[in-house]
From Swiss-Prot:
It comes from Mycobacterium tuberculosis (strain ATCC 25618 / H37Rv). Disulfide bonds: none annotated. InterPro entries: NTF2-like_dom_sf, SnoaL-like. Gene3D superfamilies: 3.10.450.50. SUPFAM superfamilies: NTF2-like. This is Uncharacterized protein Rv2910c. Was identified as a high-confidence drug target.
């Protein structure tokens, strides 16, 4: 029996690229949730543009955003970033993705209010000598609800 090559099948390289990018997105969430902000240096390019304005944040280049994250997230003793619906498109040494994030954030204080955020991460990536890195990230708001 002859095997017929299905042209719609992903190559091993394409599968590897997609898995590496998916892991990079998980690495972002882990770095944020564990407050290991220096780990973000292995997620973003040094000149990456990041736009968090859709949910009340700021936009700018990675160094500015990294500093802002380490300051503003101190207002929340507990938070978590849960990712899903990974849609990754690879084109040679560049790629893009759209991933949904569910992000509950507990405010400090006696009332323990929780801000539930639903958002999309729309990202562009570039392959570097050290692996894939995010070169552009824009948040798109789905919902925010305080409880």
């Amino acid at each position: 029996m002859c095997a017929v090559l299905d042209r719609s099948m992903l190559s091993v390289a394409e599968i590897s690229d997609r898995l590496e990018i998916q892991q990079l997105l998980v690495d972002y969430s882990s770095a944020i949730d564990q407050r290991r902000f220096d780990d973000l240096d292995r997620v973003f390019t040094p000149d990456a543009y990041i736009d968090y304005r859709a949910l009340g944040g700021i936009d700018g280049r990675y160094p500015k955003i990294k500093q802002w994250l380490s300051q503003v997230l101190g207002n929340f003793p507990v938070y978590a970033h849960m990712l899903g619906n990974f849609s990754v498109r690879v084109d040679g040494d560049t790629a893009s993705s759209r991933v949904i994030c569910f992000n509950p954030m507990v405010f400090a204080g006696d009332r323990q209010q929780v801000l539930f955020c639903g958002l999309w991460y729309d990202d562009d990536f570039v392959r570097t000598p050290d692996g894939w890195r995010i070169i552009r990230r824009v948040e798109t708001k789905c919902f925010q609800k305080m409880m």
